[in-house]
Amino acid sequence: LRYAVNDHLIAFWHRFVGPNMSAITAGGGSEVYDIIVDRAFSEYMGAAFEDICLDFTRRHAKEVMGVTAQEVGQIWGHADFDIDVAGRLLDGTHFYGECKWRSAPIDRRIVATLKERSDKTAYGRGRSGHQLLLFSRRGFRPDVAELPSVDASIHLIDPDRLVFEPTLAPRDRPDDDAADSPNGGFRP
């Protein structure tokens, strides 16, 4: 039986802090960071970023693609590729996504690769159209940033959008006078 830590903050502690506690408590925290953490941080964050993107897709598919997601996961095990985010919306439309935690904006080559991979996979075969999600730590090159205005099936998600707040239903919106009400604005 094998267990994995599903909380990235705890996983970070167990990967970088715990094993180096003696050096850190001896005053070598900066050195631990420079020699160990800094060298492995991008790799560590790449996997964490994929999980963040999957969670975002589960929660916000309707806001992004117009329909709630029925299933969200990843495609692994192909000889020549994996797909970071994949799933199906309630209307049967499939979607595929690429998550990039890198220091450069996403370019057209990455978009083309995702299109090629989405066409190769057996998941969603026979579908009539699909949507593409591109998640980027550093945004998108100008030629990629204009793609959603030309092709409505392409969705670009940068860090600002990853932390977006959904629109509250009218019954969930706080009243202006909620603080003055006897029950503090609570609604059953």
Which ranges hold each PLM region?
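Accessory nucleic acid-recognition modules appended to NTPase machines
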Residues: 1-82
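Conserved nucleotide-binding/hydrolysis micro-motifs of P-loop NTPases
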Residues: 10, 101-104, 138-141
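Flexible, glycine-rich phosphate/dinucleotide-binding loops
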Residues: 12, 19, 94, 141, ...
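Extended hydrophobic-aromatic, low-complexity segments
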Residues: 22-24, 65-67, 82-83, 93-98, ...
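Basic, amphipathic alpha-helical patches used to engage nucleic acids or provide basic targeting signals
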Residues: 105-127, 147-150
